[in-house]
Amino acid sequence: RENEADLIIAAEFATPEAINFMATHARGLICAPLSPERADTLQLPLMTSVNRENMSTAFTVSVDAAHDITTGISAGERSLTIRTLADPKATVNDFVQPGHVFPLRAVPGGVLRRAGHTEATIDLVRMAGLQPAGVCCEIMKDDGTMARIGDLGPFQKKYGLKACTVAQLIEHRRAQEKQIRLVETVKMPTDYGDFTCHLYESHLDGALHLALVHGEISADKPTLVRVHSECLT
């Protein structure tokens, strides 16, 4: 989407050293992606009701932790704010607004709905079994322009970092996750024989899909499939 490279960590592991590394070596804007559920729990409103940003990045109001903070900008204090965002016991009262950390609200469904770094961050921490809060920071080259995938080799080697693309994450999720749930199954007798009708709901957008099945489906035999995008005929 942005065609930029980001450093990403889980928010609960946001040590002062990690935030200082991002500020020193990545040098982009340090943001804190949150799942929509987490953003709602912390009552973080969007920064603007009319998002005109090129990529529709969903910035919420900026925050600082409400306790043990002076100005909020140091690596240590930003790391405290970020870890508090990930703390499942934290509430809206544990933050002040505005602040020096920029939460980003991910869309439901993650990278399968929006192929952005916000969603990639949340998908990765969820896959790791961690709290749905992360940290991301764009990587800038020495000349101040944004690093692309072809620029990352020396950076990765120097600091011992692993890399993946949003496209790889999308491919992995499509291969490993079930994207629908069975809602109901009914028998459907017709003039052309007895069918079974299955109703499925998409986890991504709530869309409903019908599958009409005639006969027995066997895993060791090919099955004839016809797809209708609008109506059943």
Task: Give short role names for the model-derived ranges.
Residues 1-233:
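Catalytic domains of riboflavin
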